[in-house]
Amino acid sequence: MSPIFMNITLAFTISLLGMLVYRSHLMASLLCLEGMMMSLFIMIALMASNAHSPLTNIMPIILLVFAACETAVGLALLVSISNTYGLDYIHNLNLLQC
C-alpha cells in the first residue's frame, strides 16, 4: 500500500472515529461526515486516474455531487434544529412527531 493511500485511509478512519465520538452534536457529525466524503473523493480520484478508463473518470464527480447534496440537507436540518431548539444536539430530534 502506497503512503498516499495509507494517509487517505487514515483520514477516513479518523473521521469515522470522530463520527462515533461526537455523535451527540449535529455540527461535529456533519464535519466528520464531510471529512469522510472528501477522503473517499480523493481516493476514488486517484484510482480513476490510474485506471485510464473513460467510465471511471465520472465516478469522482458523482461522489462530489452526492456529497454536496448531503451537505445541503445536513445544513438545512442544522438550521432548522438550531432555530427550533437553540441547540445542535441530535437527541432533540424525534422522528415520530409530525
UniProtKB/Swiss-Prot annotation:
InterPro entries, A to Z: NADH_UbQ_OxRdtase_chain4L/K, NUOK/Mnh_C1-like
Group of enzyme by EC: translocase
Location of this chain's protein in the cell: Mitochondrion inner membrane
GO molecular-function term, one example from the UniProt record: NADH dehydrogenase (ubiquinone) activity
Protein's GO biological process: ATP synthesis coupled electron transport
Signal peptide interval: none
Reactions listed under catalytic activity: a ubiquinone + NADH + 5 H(+)(in) = a ubiquinol + NAD(+) + 4 H(+)(out)
Any one of the GO CC terms: mitochondrial inner membrane
Transmembrane regions listed in the UniProt entry: 1-21, 26-46, 61-81
Membrane topology: Multi-pass membrane protein
EC number, UniProt record: 7.1.1.2
Alphabetic keyword roster: Electron transport, Membrane, Mitochondrion, Mitochondrion inner membrane, NAD, Respiratory chain, Translocase, Transmembrane, Transmembrane helix, Transport, Ubiquinone
Family to which this protein belongs: Belongs to the complex I subunit 4L family.
Function description: Core subunit of the mitochondrial membrane respiratory chain NADH dehydrogenase (Complex I) which catalyzes electron transfer from NADH through the respiratory chain, using ubiquinone as an electron acceptor. Part of the enzyme membrane arm which is embedded in the lipid bilayer and involved in proton translocation.
Subunit: Core subunit of respiratory chain NADH dehydrogenase (Complex I) which is composed of 45 different subunits.
Descriptive protein name: NADH-ubiquinone oxidoreductase chain 4L
